[in-house]
Amino acid sequence: MYYHSTRSDSITATAAQGILQGLASDGGLFISPLTALDWEDLMDRDTFTMATKILSHLLPDVEHMDRLVEQAYRGKFETEDLTPLVPVGDRFVLELFRGPTSAFKDVALCMLPQLLTAAKTVKGMEEDILILTATSGDTGKAALVGFQ
């Protein structure tokens, strides 16, 4: 599967290339083509299985996604269900603050180091990756904790 830049269909990348490169050469984001996924099959699955199936679907050249999901999330969130859906009166609230820094960004930033490591393996890359952040909010802390 190839990802395309949001600014040009002619700029493409595999999942591993997109993860390592970050942005497309034209400054656009890499997006995947819309492909069918059996959403009904995910309805009664636990969070780890859902994450594994969705990420495997979107990133087919990354192997052992189940192991990456386990390493990213197991034991790092307050609840087994990473982002529990909690009834509040006649409505539901998705709790996105159960991660290590209590920021919604923990969901993505705990997975990012696993994906970077897997992408390096796919590309046969041995160089270290330098992550530089600057923030006035919770993003930097969430990124730092994700990489610890």
Language-model region placement:
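PLP-dependent amino-acid enzyme catalytic core
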Residues: 1-148
